[in-house]
């Protein structure tokens, strides 16, 4: 995952995925993800770990604290790919929805929230809907609405509270 030619990297990732999870493969990838100075190499390690089902909850929690917004955003996308991640990761994602300075990360959260269970997504959507700095973003308000829309049937009163307190134009 450190080769300069991306073709070799993608080919190696595919081979690793075909082989499946092996701790001897995951350990060097974890080291790259947590400590490599180049964000693109950390992303490649993240993708490879995900491909071999080696992205554990503790490792993902560390990746959600990465200094690079792309690593944080991709971690969110990969974690929510198949539904709800662990409760501790949901808490971390909710904290990022409230406090992350990056619009890219908040956009990834809004997009991923659509794949969360309705009860899990409401607090996340509520935090996103209150971000005044995203009101003029061309994507975040719509993605937030799409995520909220799926939760309305589960808890109409809570959804109404969230939507009435949003910082965006009327959703």
List PLM regions with ranges:
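Long, ordered, helix-rich scaffold segments
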Residues: 1-171
């Amino acid at each position: 995952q450190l080769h300069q030619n991306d073709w070799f990297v993608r080919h190696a990732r595919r081979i690793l995925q075909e082989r499946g999870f092996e701790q001897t493969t995951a350990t060097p990838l974890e080291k790259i993800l947590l400590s490599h100075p180049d964000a693109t190499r950390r992303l490649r390690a993240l993708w490879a770990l995900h491909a071999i089902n080696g992205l554990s909850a503790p490792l993902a929690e560390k990746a959600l604290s990465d200094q690079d917004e792309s690593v944080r955003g991709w971690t969110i996308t990969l974690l929510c790919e198949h539904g709800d991640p662990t409760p501790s990761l949901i808490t971390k994602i909710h904290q990022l929805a409230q406090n992350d300075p990056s619009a890219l990360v908040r956009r990834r959260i809004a997009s991923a929230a659509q794949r969360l269970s309705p009860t899990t997504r409401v607090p996340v959507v509520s935090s996103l809907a209150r971000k005044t700095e995203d009101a003029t973003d061309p994507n975040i308000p719509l993605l937030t609405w799409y995520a909220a829309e799926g939760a309305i049937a589960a808890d109409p009163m809570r959804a109404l509270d969230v939507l009435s307190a949003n910082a965006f134009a009327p959703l």
